[in-house]
Amino acid sequence: MIASPAAYPARFAAVLLSLATLCLLNGCGPSYARPRLAGDLQELCAHEYQLPVRAQLIGHDVTVICAIEGLLKATEGQVEFSPTTKANEQLGNVVEAIHRVVLSADWPVNFYAIVATDPKVPGAWVMLVRYLDDVRRVYANAIPTVEFFQRTILNLQYDPAQPLDANRVVLHDMTLEQFLVMQMSKRLQNAFRADVHFQEAYDVGSCVGQYRQGTFQFVVNMAPREGGPELTEHETSAIFDGALALIATVLHDYHFEAFNDVQLLHFPSGKTMGVPKTRLWTFLPRPS
């Protein structure tokens, strides 16, 4: 019942192209020492791309905060990520600068985040999070481009009454478990919203998850629209099966074994399903 998540739109092309050119630079540039890594990254963005940024390195994570005009579009109180050509190029430049530094650093970086605001849209910001191993794998053609984008966390936040608190969004030694929860929650949500079977009759809300004491827990938020039919037992079972297939695929592709089980909760019905790790692998799609 779950459709494959749609590919990221064409507006990411400039960012992708900047990544592709970097594979020629990887391993050839200078080594960036940890004490100066954040400062070198800021200097690179300012001098080569004329874009002031603020970079922070905490533990093994890098966060870059920047302002890019034209990144967001506001219409009647609604905000969407719709960068202009120039804004997309600037975002790609930030990505390129980060990769040039972290892939040549003398200190292992696990994750990086870009937190970008648009001066024309106060109260809104976009956060992009990536795992460095995914970056290396896409450079080596070990994963396809579409899969790389699916592994990228891209969240848009909008609260005109609450300005951006940089301390709240800076990465603090993110774990792989946390990253996988964020990624799988977003992929589940996108998959349900792309499923034509549910598009007309049901509202798909945010799918949220957590990893706690060896258990991955996810809430599937799917409610019938006003006057619409409740989900049948067969539909609920199909939703759970599809969710488990997606979760199994992601964890298998990351070779992640440090968990005991997966638990699903459907909102608003309250129906649940749990499977141990050994059974989860039976939900892996069969090779075509």
Regions found by a protein language model. Give the residues of each.
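C-terminal motif of bacterial Sec signal peptides marking the signal peptidase cleavage site
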Residues: 24-27
